[in-house]
Amino acid sequence: MDDFERRRELRRQKREEMRLEAERLSYQRNDDDEEEAARERRRRARQERLRQKEEGDVSGEVTEKSEVNAQNSVAEEETKRSTDDEAALLERLARREERRQKRLQEALERQKEFDPTITDGSLSVPSRREVNNVEENEITGKEEKVETRQGRCEIEETETVTKSYQRNNWRQDGEEEGKKEEKDSEEEKPKEVPTEENQVDVAVEKSTDKEEVVETKTLAVNAENDTNAMLEGEQSITDAADKEKEEAEKEREKLEAEEKERLKAEEEKKAAEEKQKAEEEKKAAEERERAKAEEEKRAAEERERAKAEEERKAAEERERAKAEEERKAAEERAKAEEERKAAEERAKAEEERKAAEERAKAEKERKAAEERERAKAEEEKRAAEEKARLEAEKLKEKKKMEEKKAQEEKAQANLLRKQEEDKEAKVEAKKESLPEKLQPTSKKDQVKDNKDKEKAPKEEMKSVWDRKRGVPEQKAQNGERELTTPKLKSTENAFGRSNLKGAANAEAGSEKLKEKQQEAAVELDELKKRREERRKILEEEEQKKKQEEAERKIREEEEKKRMKEEIERRRAEAAEKRQKVPEDGVSEEKKPFKCFSPKGSSLKIEERAEFLNKSAQKSGMKPAHTTAVVSKIDSRLEQYTSAVVGNKAAKPAKPAASDLPVPAEGVRNIKSMWEKGNVFSSPGGTGTPNKETAGLKVGVSSRINEWLTKTPEGNKSPAPKPSDLRPGDVSGKRNLWEKQSVEKPAASSSKVTATGKKSETNGLRQFEKEP
């Protein structure tokens, strides 16, 4: 709330200031109106004094007081304004006196006009007195307000504006006389008039007013005593006016003389003050000049002394710098010698390192060749094992087929036995229906018939097995009846139909096996083609590696040569710098480090300076070499990469069973291709068989075994021999990796079972052996 009140008060003050500023501007514009109103008031007051000549001393005193108040108020207003020069003041005084004389004459003429009607004038005196009293009261009240306004704050200046508007109305009433007294307003408004001058003007006006009052009194007495004495009164008035004029002239001259003397005294005083001030300023300037000259003299002496000191120090500095330069030259020579030796040692170490790298590389290649030979032997061994496994599988498959055929024959025999029993039952029924004459008469014959019936199925089964095995049929034994022949014929017909069905099924299975064999042959051809493509890719990579190695050696030779040239050039530059010893201390500022120390600790600081110089120069040489190497980093990126790979490969790998050999970069890429399955037609893993091979199972394996055993020349021509394997052949690496992974105890449980799991030599997928 207090903040709100404070802001509101500030806004109110700003509005008030703006309003007062506007009123001040209007007041300045209305100064002329105020001056005209003051002149109008004085003119009316003088007229009223002339009109009140018939009144008593009371009215005279009232007019005197009002005039004095008016003059005092005007004087107070005039004290706030500035005056012109002395000549303008005198001219204004002269013009004012002339106008006063004219106004007196006009008053006398108006008095003469009032004389014939003196009674009317006496009757109207009270009324005019009341009007004059009202006007005088208003004028005095206004003048008092003007006086109080000058003592108040700026907020109360609004009253002055309103009164100025009222005075403008009064000016319109007496516009004609206001025009006459425009110049008088300028005279009565002197700028910066002192209070003494205002008091003198007031005293003069008071004296003239008193004389006018006396004059009016005498005129009133003469008029009352006798109207016939008008001429004498007029004469006395004119005499009194002349006398007053002379006295006023004397008083004016006296005042002018006093004013001139006062102004002259003030001018002399001002001139003396100015002169004294000028003398003081002159003395101060001289003092400043003297102090400045002394300061300059001291500064010049100081500069001379400092210059001499600097020259002495510079000479000492040059001597010390010369000694330091000689010492540094000796150090530089020793340092150059050390650098030369260090460069030679570095070159020697570099050559030894390169030789070691070459040896390591040769050792690596030898080991790689041994690995390839071992992989080749392992491949041959695996091929032999695979062949033996295929033979064993073939025998096992043949045995299974025989068992299956035996089971089928047994089932067919059971079926035939059942059919034979049915037929025997039918034959028994027919026999019973035959006439009794055909039946055997004796029990001996019946027993014989029963035995024959029991033997007949056995002989039929025997004949069937003999026919299947290729044994010729034997003739019927003696004592066998002819009834067995139709039974055998019927059984032969039934068994022949079943054999035809089995033969048709066997032919359909053989056709399927042929189709699957053809598909397997096509897949083998594709695998051979892919293997040939891989071999070509490996050959190209090997050639590319050899070419890159040759280029790398050439670049290394060029780099060695360039480094030697750079070392020789720097040595020559260092020798030239040592020969050019600077004669002055200017070039010493360009040195990397200088140490000027006190004599006590000079030895330690010089040693420290030498160390810093050496380190600075070494740091200055290293960036140059680094920039030279970095400038060719794009062209040498492959060289650095191959060198890093060679360094890593140069480390001898421990032949542990759990560690894998570190292959070359090309072999690693091909190995990743093998692992991703991009080489094969299908991306299946080594452990998961193909869908087609999974469907083949026994038949495909038997056909593959037949293909391996019957057509060995077809296998030799497209498939590369173990001797055809190149140093970076991927198959050898892959088989070696598989061998080592098989040897691991952790992987043995998953890859090697009780019967064993092995991969084929031609890149075929693994076929698990049936348990």
Swiss-Prot record:
Q: What is its main location?
A: cytoplasm
- Give a yes or no for keyword Iron in this entry: no
Per the record, where are the segments of Basic and acidic residues compositional bias?
Answer: 47-67, 104-115, 139-155, 170-194, 203-215, 240-435, 442-484, 509-518, 525-592, 723-742
Positions of modified residues (Phosphotyrosine): Y27, Y640
Posttranslational mods: Phosphorylated in non-muscle cells. Phosphorylation by CDK1 during mitosis causes caldesmon to dissociate from microfilaments. Phosphorylation reduces caldesmon binding to actin, myosin, and calmodulin as well as its inhibition of actomyosin ATPase activity. Phosphorylation also occurs in both quiescent and dividing smooth muscle cells with similar effects on the interaction with actin and calmodulin and on microfilaments reorganization.
Where does the record place its sequence repeats? 251-265, 266-278, 279-291, 294-306, 309-321, 324-336, 337-349, 350-362, 363-375, 378-390
What are the boundaries of the region Weak actin-binding? 726-752
Q: Where in the cell is it found?
A: Cytoplasm, Cytoskeleton; Cytoplasm, Myofibril; Cytoplasm, Cytoskeleton, Stress fiber
Q: Where is this region: Calmodulin-binding?
A: 674-680
Q: Where is this region: Tropomyosin-binding?
A: 523-580, 622-632
Which intervals of the chain are annotated as region Myosin and calmodulin-binding? 26-199
Give the coiled coil ranges: none
Q: Where is the composition biased (Polar residues)?
A: 679-691
GO molecular function terms here? actin binding; calmodulin binding; myosin II binding; S100 protein binding
Spans annotated as Disordered:
23-91, 104-599, 676-771
Pfam family of the protein (one):
Caldesmon
The record describes the protein's role as: Actin- and myosin-binding protein implicated in the regulation of actomyosin interactions in smooth muscle and nonmuscle cells (could act as a bridge between myosin and actin filaments). Stimulates actin binding of tropomyosin which increases the stabilization of actin filament structure. In muscle tissues, inhibits the actomyosin ATPase by binding to F-actin. This inhibition is attenuated by calcium-calmodulin and is potentiated by tropomyosin. Interacts with actin, myosin, two molecules of tropomyosin and with calmodulin.
PANTHER family, A to Z:
CALDESMON (PTHR18949:SF0)
Name of the protein in its database record: Caldesmon
The lineage, from the top, is: Eukaryota, Metazoa, Chordata, Craniata, Vertebrata
